[in-house]
């Protein structure tokens, strides 16, 4: 049986990336709370470095 999680980097960036977060009010709230908490990576694309840009 095939498992449900079949990872794709492009899909991951597009759904959970920095620009996607910035595009909605709640997404910006997510980024703000992660900044406040001091997270090392704010979003998937920012964690991927230059590959996500």
From Swiss-Prot:
Keyword Ribosomal protein: yes
Biased composition (Basic residues): 1-19, 26-40
Segments of this protein annotated with the region Disordered: 1-53
InterPro entries reported for this sequence: Ribosomal_bL34, Ribosomal_bL34_CS
Highest rank taxon of the organism: Bacteria
Molecular-function annotations in GO: structural constituent of ribosome
GO annotations of cellular component type: ribonucleoprotein complex; ribosome
Keyword set, alphabetical order: Ribonucleoprotein, Ribosomal protein
Residue stretches of biased makeup (Polar residues): 42-53
Keyword Ribonucleoprotein part of the UniProt annotation: yes
GO BP: any one term: translation
Family from the record: Belongs to the bacterial ribosomal protein bL34 family.
Protein name (database record): Large ribosomal subunit protein bL34
Taxonomic path: Bacteria, Pseudomonadati, Chlorobiota, Chlorobiia, Chlorobiales
